[in-house]
């Protein structure tokens, strides 16, 4: 199985499949198709259980994708409060700026997320 199947599992919250990929040797910090890491895809889609699993397996919490976007920024852009909460609790850098020049706090209009980032 390749990137497409792994990315599908990451985006759709199939934790069992993600665990199988990782147990089979998939690097949790590998750059996938699209120039993004597994953590970015999970964060984009609000898959907090997968985010938590990947972090436990050593995923780089501050990894930037090909556009300079971190997983925390991805979660902020998409309004995924639980993922933002996980990233903040695990020490994600809240000051990294995305390609638009905005940090995590500045990049969201969601008040619940802003409260987590203060």
Curated annotation (Swiss-Prot):
Q: Entry's Pfam families? A: Ank_2
Recorded hits in InterPro entries, A to Z, give: Ankyrin_rpt (IPR002110), Ankyrin_rpt-contain_sf (IPR036770)
Task: From the UniProt record, list the coiled-coil ranges.
Answer: none
Q: Name one GO cellular component term.
A: cytoplasm
Q: Where are the ANK repeats?
A: 1-30, 34-65, 67-98
- Known PROSITE patterns for this protein? ANK_REP_REGION, ANK_REPEAT
| The UniProt record lists the keyword Signal | no
BP GO terms, sorted: protein K6-linked ubiquitination; regulation of barbed-end actin filament capping
**Keywords, comma-separated and alphabetical:** ANK repeat, Cytoplasm, Nucleus, Repeat
- Briefly, what is this protein's role? Regulates NF-kappa-B transcription factor activity. Promotes growth of cardiomyocytes, but not cardiomyocyte proliferation. Promotes cardiac muscle hypertrophy. Plays a role in the regulation of the growth of actin filaments. Inhibits the activity of the F-actin-capping protein complex.
Could you tell me what this protein is called?
A: Myotrophin
Protein species of origin: Xenopus laevis (African clawed frog)
Gene that encodes the chain: mtpn
């Amino acid at each position: 199985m390749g990137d497409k199947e792994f990315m599908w599992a990451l985006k759709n919250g199939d934790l069992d499949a993600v665990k199988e990929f990782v147990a089979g040797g998939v690097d949790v910090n590998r750059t996938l198709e699209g120039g993004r890491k597994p953590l970015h895809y999970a964060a984009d889609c609000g898959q907090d259980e997968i985010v938590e699993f990947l972090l436990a397996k050593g995923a780089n919490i501050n990894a930037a994708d090909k556009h300079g976007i971190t997983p925390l920024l991805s979660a902020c852009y998409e309004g995924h409060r639980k993922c933002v909460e996980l990233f903040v609790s695990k020490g994600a850098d809240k000051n990294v700026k995305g390609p638009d020049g905005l940090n995590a706090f500045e990049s969201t209009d969601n008040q619940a997320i802003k409260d987590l980032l203060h």
